[in-house]
Each structure stands twice: as structure tokens, then as C-alpha cells.
Amino acid sequence: MLPPYFLFKEMTDTQYIGRFAPSPSGELHFGSLIAALGSYLQARARQGRWLVRIEDIDPPREVPGAAETILRQLEHYGLHWDGDVLWQSQRHDAYREALAWLHEQGLSYYCTCTRARIQSIGGIYDGHCRVLHHGPDNAAVRIRQQHPVTQFTDQLRGIIHADEKLAREDFIIHRRDGLFAYNLAVVVDDHFQGVTEIVRGADLIEPTVRQISLYQLFGWKVPDYIHLPLALNPQGAKLSKQNHAPALPKGDPRPVLIAALQFLGQQAEAHWQDFSVEQILQSAVKNWRLTAVPESAIVNSTFSNASC
């Protein structure tokens, strides 16, 4: 049986399509800008489209009004997207259909194991419920791994090897609390939107092999991946909403854009005060070099909570 109709994305051409997909758990900070700017420049330098998706499928983590603020921040920093914003909260039917297809193909199963049990055996799920034929009551849904992906090629970093046990784990695609898992939603939506290359932060390297395994189960073409360096605070922690990284400044966006370009190893206008945001970005697109982007994380105290 072929995947249901909605899962097919008819590609009319071979145009490059990139995306930025923030979760509305708070405002964008400097680390978020790195991911947004890097994906934007890579798409525009390839004469491609740049899409924005709001990943609002985890209501307990969402901050009211954050999604709208994120969109305003992107516009303030000159990062204008193509087409309509895709909201994951409006895509539940697609995720349900994907889950149903996987279940019909015998590629998923219900699991009632608790987090405490999994932690007691070392933190990696052991397939305990694979042959127990549980029903959906008080159960999560796990993928039945067929061909685990243990490595992938990153267009910046080369071949990346995954932890073998993690790669072979039957991971959750629908949570016990009824929420759709990130790995399922992101794969279904990236395919639906025709994304050809995913440019994001290096903190998302780990789930990549799981996402590739889902692409393969569905029989879809796997996109290319680029994982950008992370901005760290002076304590060595990633700038994040959880670590209280300050929101992007609401004033003149140009000095922050210049700092982000320099962070990514790119040529920046020496006399940026003489240029508009649009001109700075046009120059950045023209001079974009992926090979100049550093692979390692960088401490950036200027935009961390240490400077607040």
C-alpha cells in the first residue's frame, strides 16, 4: 500500500527550498537569529525559496503571543519569507493520517512503558512492547525500526556518525499525552512543503538520523542537512530560551545582523552605518560562502544573559 495522497508532494521543478521553523516558546534571541540568517542566506544564494513554519504542537511549552512576536522580529531584521506561514497546529489531520498509515503497514506499535522503567535500564528503550500488542489506551506510539540510520552527510561537517544504540531505538512518534512528537511532525511537514535542504543549529544533529529513518519508511527523498555552529554563553551553555537568553534588540537591527554575519564567518560591511538592512542582506547573499562557516560552537557574551 502506498502512502496516502496527502503525503505526496508533487515537485514541479528542482528549485531549492529552505525553511526556518521556530517553536513559539519565547521570542527569538541571538542564537535563533544565527539559524534564521544562515538558512535565509543559503536559500537566497541558491536563488531558492525560504519558508517559515511555526512549530506550535506543544501547547504546555508555548508562550502566548510568542508566534506573532517571532514573525514581527523576522520582518524587523529584514528576513522576509516566501508564501504563507505554515502552522503545525493546523496540521493535525496530516499527522493522524501519517500515524494511521504507519500502523497499517506494521511500522509502529503502542507502548505503555514509563519513563522511569526506561531510565532504569539505562535510558535507551529496549523494544519491550514490540510484541505485546497493546491498544491505544494510555500508550505512546513508537516507530518499529526497520533499517536504522547510523550516519549521514552534513554539507558543512561531512559524515556524522550517530550513537548506535540511539539510532536503533524505536523512538516515539505520538506521545502518551496525545501530542504529536517533533520527529514525526517535522518530517511530514518538511516533505509537504518540498524542503530540499534543512539548515539549523547543531543542537539538532542528534535527531537527524531518526528523521532520515522516517523519510525512508515513507519512501520519500531525504533532504540535505547543514548544522550551523551554536552561540554559547560564557558558562558554555547554548543561548536558549530555557537559559534566559535575552530577546533580540528592538532597535536598529543592523549591528546585530553584522554580528551574526561575523559569527557565521561571513564578510560584513565595514561601514554598515551607510547601508540599509536590505542592502546589508543583499551583500550578504552575494558574498555568502558556506565553506567560511565555522563548525565549532562560539562563546558570544554580547548577546547572552551575562550582559543583561
From Swiss-Prot:
Keywords, sorted A to Z: Aminoacyl-tRNA synthetase, ATP-binding, Ligase, Metal-binding, Nucleotide-binding, Zinc
Gene Ontology cellular component list: cytosol
Main enzyme class: ligase
Binding site for Zn(2+): C111, C113, Y125, C129
Pfam families membership: tRNA-synt_1c (PF00749)
Residue positions binding L-glutamate: R19, F20, A21, P22, S23, E55, Y182, R200
Chain positions recorded as ATP binding sites: K241
InterPro entries tied to this protein: Glu-Q_tRNA(Asp)_Synthase, Glu/Gln-tRNA-synth, Glu/Gln-tRNA-synth_Ib_cat-dom, GluQ/Sye, Rossmann-like_a/b/a_fold
Superkingdom assignment: Bacteria
Cofactor remark: Binds 1 zinc ion per subunit.
Annotated GO MF terms: ATP binding; glutamate-tRNA ligase activity; zinc ion binding
Cofactors named for this entry: Zn(2+)
Short motif ('HIGH' region): ranges: 22-32
Chain span(s) of sequence motif 'KMSKS' region: 238-242
EC nos: 6.1.1.-
GO biological process: glutamyl-tRNA aminoacylation; tRNA wobble base modification
Protein role: Catalyzes the tRNA-independent activation of glutamate in presence of ATP and the subsequent transfer of glutamate onto tRNA(Asp). Glutamate is transferred on the 2-amino-5-(4,5-dihydroxy-2-cyclopenten-1-yl) moiety of the queuosine in position 34 of the tRNA(Asp), the wobble position of the QUC anticodon. Does not transfer glutamate to either tRNA(Glu) or tRNA(Gln). The incapacity of the glutamylated tRNA(Asp) to bind elongation factor Tu suggests that it is not involved in ribosomal protein biosynthesis.
HAMAP family: Glu_Q_tRNA_synth
Similarity comment: Belongs to the class-I aminoacyl-tRNA synthetase family. GluQ subfamily.
Protein name: Glutamyl-Q tRNA(Asp) synthetase
